[in-house]
Amino acid sequence: MTLYSRPTCPHCHRVRLVLAEKGIAMEIINIEGSKLPEDLVELNPYNNVPTLVDRELALYDPRIIMEYLEERFPHPPLMPVDPVARARFRLALYRIERDWYSLVDEIEQSPGKPHVRAKKFLRESLLAAADAFAAKPYFLSDEFSLVDCSIAPILWRLPRYEIDLPAQAKALGKYAERIFNRPAFKSSLTELEREMRDAA
């Protein structure tokens, strides 16, 4: 099993976090620069990462990869068993991608630009969801889940994006610290991702 990843990509980070939480041993090929390995170009028509290769199977959407890993390696579980609860979690994953990752992608695609609009909307959207982070130890749950795996890379990058959260977002800050202190989160970080916080 092989994961093609970039060392600073937030989408790759959330897949790496799932791997770390589940203790899955996997070859991770870190791609730096614009040139992609030839085998990746052949496997993935979109030429992007993360891309997971498991024997004859090649997956190249982060959410599909995360759910595949959850089903292939069910322990520890990162999704609830109940179908209604699973549907709620899937909807949360969809909204995180649509509402937050769309803005993150805008910021990440041209890091030299100010991206005032995207940063403003991301900050406001996180603040609007702040109460959801106060209700339980993890997002919508007492247990760590794929939803948290998707949120954590965004929160880790806020200083890099020059997004500061006000005092009233204390619950969000505490939630972030809970996740950042998890051993799996620490081991999911690449050297360049560690430097994002060291430099902030």
Question: Model-predicted segments: where are they?
Answer:
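Conserved beta-strand edge residues that scaffold enzyme active sites
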Residues: 33-34, 172, 193
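Surface-exposed helix-capping loop/turn segments at secondary-structure junctions
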Residues: 131-142, 184-188
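GST-like domain detector, emphasizing the conserved glutathione-binding G-site
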Residues: 1-130, 137
